[in-house]
Amino acid sequence: KTGATIGKTAIVPEDLPRSNTTSHVGKITLPSNHCPEYFYYVLTSAVVQDQIQDLSAMQSTRPELGIDGMKNLKVVVPPLKEQNRIASYLDAETSKIDAVLNVKRSQLDRICDFKQSFVFEYVTGKKHIKEAM
């Protein structure tokens, strides 16, 4: 809600209906004809995050977004069936992307480890540079 964490979004599980909030955390309780997963994607989208930044910047020198600012967010709300369809599709596709990212991160970690080892061997004298002939 404030500062660097403004716009962070999460879904509160239904088994935590009485979760606590503070003056820096807001909770949106959706009506039954709204899909929480769809609204998670909406609220984390670049379009809405830009709105959050714009609305919070207008309020003070320290970025803050109150409930009135939240009410001013412009979001598309299709029928529940379409919300569910969009959320399911995004869940499936972003899971695939996350799997690829995890593989790439693992590969990058191994390359970074190799680089550190490579540099270490030369700066500690374990290996020497061969002179060109």
Language-model features and meaning:
Residues L30-P36:
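Ligand-binding loop in jelly-roll beta-barrel domains
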Residues T2-T21, E37-Y41, D50-S56, S60:
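Short, ligand-facing micro-motifs at secondary-structure edges
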Residues T5, R18-G26, A57-N84:
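A short glycine-rich beta-alpha junction/loop motif
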Residues G26, Y40-T44, D54, F120:
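Generic alpha-helical structural context detector
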Residues S23-G26, E37-Y38, K71-N72, S95, ...:
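Positions in alpha-helical segments
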